[in-house]
Amino acid sequence: MSHQNQLIPQAYISNFHNRLTNEDDGIPIFTMAQQTRQHKRAKVVNYAEYDNDLFDEFNMNGSNFNNADTHYKDNAVSHENTPALTNGVTMDGSEYNVLENMNGADSIISNNKYDAGSNMVVESLSGLNSNNNASNGPSNKAQAQDIGNAVLPDLQDQHHNPFNILRYPKIRDTFINGKVVSPYRLNTDQETKANANSGEAIMIPITLDIEHMGHTIKDQFLWNYNDDSISPEEFASIYCKDLDMTSATLQTQIANIIKEQLKDLENIAATEIMSDLHVIINLTCNLQDRFFEDNFQWNLNDKSLTPERFATSIVQDLGLTREFIPLISQSLHETILKIKKDWVDGHLIQDHVPNDAAFGYLSGIRLDIDELGSNWCPRVEILTKEEIQKREIEKERNLRRLKRETDRLSRRGRRRLDDLETTMRM
């Protein structure tokens, strides 16, 4: 493996390599070796051999700032592609003239010097004015970089029209050929937005688990049922473009899954519970090797606290990463919909909430001498993948057991009511 002292790319762009002494044992600034894929040998990355196409942004309005390939050697300046070069001398403060071809005419940068800060001082420049427009007026003082930077986009002036940056060739090519797309909000008119936000938000959790051409797509997100600004087909099209998978079969499959889950849960999600209904929720979710678990009491009739606000508060209190916010809110929405479904089907019949509150109160102080209320606190554990799967299996097993007990109690209550009605008929 061979190493070679290199300058970082920013040094070449900023003319930094000319400000160093050209001694044989120059100052080592940057050393890098990159392994190649096909060979075990190392390949030294030579940043000096940059692509001239990177500077195509400077070719604006017929101007050509890079038609001359400039080489700096032995403290002298030479242009290979320019018609002529006069007075190319050392950089100790001497003057030199460079003949350039700008806007189809010959323009001369004359009487150029380097000041104490090693910046080129331009005393006379014909062909460009202070705004970098074609003119014959002189310029008092400018740096060499300012000539090129004048045509670069000014990000501070882009807030009026975000598409102004597309006037620059390199950015426009990246926009067209790359993954950069316009924001989704620009594709929706204001009238559609007003109609979409007119109704109350009914959030339905959507889960994708798809196998397609050797790829596994797993994703979870929330869908506002009252938002008509985008259809499942449009969402599937944008979703596949983001994944670089433009398969019509995959788009149709994603759209059908979304519509199927919306159809199954729309009635339950839109159901309003008029009276207070307190339930105990055991919430679990995992992000990589971190397993989150919490046990709390939730009122299904209370709309002041949404799952999104609850998830944000939990993440802030525990100092978790923001990736936990959609995971916790998604899991809480799914749990609430399961509980509402049991309530609609008549399986949720309870006169007392098993919240371990003192004296049988609806909420309040809990008497827990052994555990000191540790079961009612959020906690995050670092577990292996097998341990997380084991926890999820145990949770599903406990939920099935509780459902069987609830069904048995409900059947026993209906049987007693039927016996009472039969006795009254006799």
Curated annotation (Swiss-Prot):
GO terms for molecular function: nucleosome binding; transcription coregulator activity. The keyword Phosphoprotein applies. Keywords: Cell cycle, Chromatin regulator, Nucleus, Phosphoprotein, Transcription, Transcription regulation. The keyword Transcription regulation applies. InterPro entries: Sfh1/SNF5, SNF5. Interacts directly with STH1. Component of the two forms of the RSC complex composed of at least either RSC1 or RSC2, and ARP7, ARP9, LDB7, NPL6, RSC3, RSC30, RSC4, RSC58, RSC6, RSC8, RSC9, SFH1, STH1, HTL1 and probably RTT102. The complexes interact with histone and histone variant components of centromeric chromatin. This is Chromatin structure-remodeling complex subunit SFH1. It comes from Saccharomyces cerevisiae (strain ATCC 204508 / S288c).
